[in-house]
Design a protein with these regions (language model features):
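Membrane-lumen/periplasm interface segments of specific transmembrane helices
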Residues: 232-313, 317-320
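Transmembrane-helix motifs of polytopic, lipid-linked glycan transferases
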Residues: 122-144
Length: 390
């Protein structure tokens, strides 16, 4: 077929680029490069976005709201809690939403607050390449050593084009800090050491509470992950338990701080309901914006599980996805929330690898990548004032 010949020709050229010992790193760099080129040429307003970063932060040393709150938290966590209670900060204020997001303030406290708005961005950017490299390595482990390396490239390139990929560290000047939660969630499925899994999950939870909800996907990974060959089987283990215990401890500490500093706010539920109703008005677009074309891989995986009558895995996987998406809808930045469930993409790759041929999987990954870079979702637009519209 004509399409096959085109794909083979492309494979040969791409294969030349990812030869050698450090080919996984090459895939990481190529994927990030493609993301930057595609994202910036598709929306030149992001050039203005980075120009403001240089003028406001680097040259003038200005701090926006998020930076100011992080700095205040880093100076004294508990004083920040007390001030929040005394000044009557309500749930719709940004300060209230960042009360328990203590990872970035801790990082700033350890490494120093001087020019932190600059070094924090560059630290995130550098670690981003390591993050994509780990994604590539896990994808390679899933696909197997005999698999064509091009499949790894297609998957990683498609993933990097998402907010959960390159967007979280290339564009995060604000800073949201989501990248660190993504990194820790990824490391919690990369290592098999229960203690490290516990620590990584704790770090992710204190970056953003959305990581707690999506830790369900990490537990599903450890319960269903095929350790022996390509078998997808249920396996309860210490890794799963480490994730669960970490979540319980986080909730316990958070509840203690809420009671201790009288931070309970009855307005939260009303705000959540109002936000949910507003987001539902753009249901399809907001859901799609979470994973763009990579949703195709997830839908394919769910279809395969249903066809193979693997209802146990299907219900666990689908239930966790619905929970993740539902929780994302109680905040206005929906696709940020959905992005926290990116482990679903790796789970989907596991399923598709087991039941599809290499050629079929290759075509699916190519389509996922192409649709992701061509679809005009919320990731592609900008709000007045420089904030990401998500």
């Amino acid at each position: 077929m004509y399409i096959d010949s085109i794909i083979i020709a492309i494979e040969k050229r791409l294969g030349f680029l990812i030869r050698g010992k450090y080919w996984l790193w090459k895939i990481a760099f190529i994927s990030v490069f493609l993301f930057v080129v595609i994202d910036f040429t598709g929306n030149m307003s992001k050039v203005v976005y980075f120009r403001s970063f240089i003028n406001d932060y680097i040259k003038q040393g200005k701090l926006d709201t998020a930076h100011s709150i992080i700095k205040a938290q880093s100076e004294d966590y508990f004083e920040f809690f007390k001030q929040g209670n005394q000044t009557g900060i309500t749930s719709n204020q940004h300060e209230a939403k960042m009360r328990f997001r203590l990872f970035l303030p801790t990082l700033v406290k350890i490494l120093g607050a001087k020019h932190f708005e600059i070094w924090l961005y560059f630290l995130t950017f550098i670690l981003g390449f390591f993050y994509i490299h780990v994604i590539a390595k896990i994808a390679f482990n899933i696909l197997g050593e005999t698999t064509n390396r091009i499949l790894v490239l297609f998957f990683v390139a498609g993933f990097t084009n998402l907010y959960a990929g390159g967007g979280s560290f290339v564009l995060d000047i604000v800073p949201y800090g989501d990248f660190f939660a993504f990194l820790f969630l990824l490391l919690s499925i990369y290592t098999r050491n229960p203690l490290l899994i516990f620590v990584y999950c704790q770090c992710a939870f204190w970056v953003d509470e959305r990581a707690l909800v999506n830790a369900i996907l990490v537990m599903i990974w450890w319960i269903f992950m095929p350790f022996n060959g390509n078998k997808v089987t249920v396996k309860l283990n210490t890794q799963w338990l480490a994730v669960f215990i970490s979540g319980v401890i986080y909730m316990g500490i958070r509840q203690y701080l809420t009671i201790r500093y009288q931070l309970h706010d009855d307005t939260y539920m009303g705000e959540f309901i109002t936000t949910f109703k507003e987001n539902v008005k753009m249901l399809s677009l907001r859901v799609w914006a979470g994973f763009d074309g990579m949703w195709i891989l997830i839908v394919m995986a769910l279809t395969i599980l249903f066809k193979e009558k693997n209802y146990q895995f299907l219900m666990a996987f689908l239930g966790s996805l619905i929970t993740s998406v539902g929780f994302a809808f109680i905040a206005y930045d929906v696709n940020r929330g959905i992005s926290y469930g990116f482990i679903a993409l790796l789970l989907s790759l596991v399923i598709c690898k087991k039941y599809l041929s290499e050629k079929e999987l290759k075509y699916i990954l190519i389509v996922c990548f192409l649709v992701s870079i061509l679809s005009p979702t919320l990731n592609k637009f900008r709000l007045v004032g420089g904030g990401q519209l998500m």
